[in-house]
């Protein structure tokens, strides 16, 4: 992964680097399962991946460095991660305020297994940062 230092002093400044995660490889064809995850509709993996790639390409075309953290996982962790149906949203995994980085905490039990994967990558990428626990709502 390219080296950079996380820094954010305003939510209105230009994005330079963002962390995304590709969608799960699983469909969510049942509305009950979707509602249990907090969604209001079912999910088709192919459509979700097309939307993700379009979003990623748009950011890259605007000059933003995009890190897909699913590409950085070890093979065994990646196998597990690809089966997590609610890993689309990375905004609450961690945040940067100034030069400090803060861990997020899963607001739903359905997302708890995703957090250690992302947090271990952040620790690897930024060992000098003291990552603090913070509940991001």
What kind of region is each of these model predictions?
Residues 1-137:
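The feature marks the mature, well-folded catalytic cores of soluble enzymes
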């Amino acid at each position: 992964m390219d080296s950079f230092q996380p820094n954010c002093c305003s939510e209105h400044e230009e994005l330079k680097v963002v962390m995304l995660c590709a969608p799960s490889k699983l469909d969510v064809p049942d509305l009950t399962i979707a509602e249990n995850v907090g969604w209001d509709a079912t999910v088709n993996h192919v459509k979700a991946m097309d939307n993700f790639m379009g979003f990623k390409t748009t950011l890259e075309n605007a000059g933003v460095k995009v890190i897909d953290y699913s590409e950085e996982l070890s093979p065994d962790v990646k196998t597990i991660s690809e089966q997590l149906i609610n890993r689309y949203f990375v905004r609450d995994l961690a945040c940067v305020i100034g030069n400090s980085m803060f861990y997020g905490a899963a607001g739903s039990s359905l997302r708890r297994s995703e957090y250690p994967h992302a947090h271990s990558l952040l620790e690897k990428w930024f060992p000098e940062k003291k990552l603090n626990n913070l509940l991001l709502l």
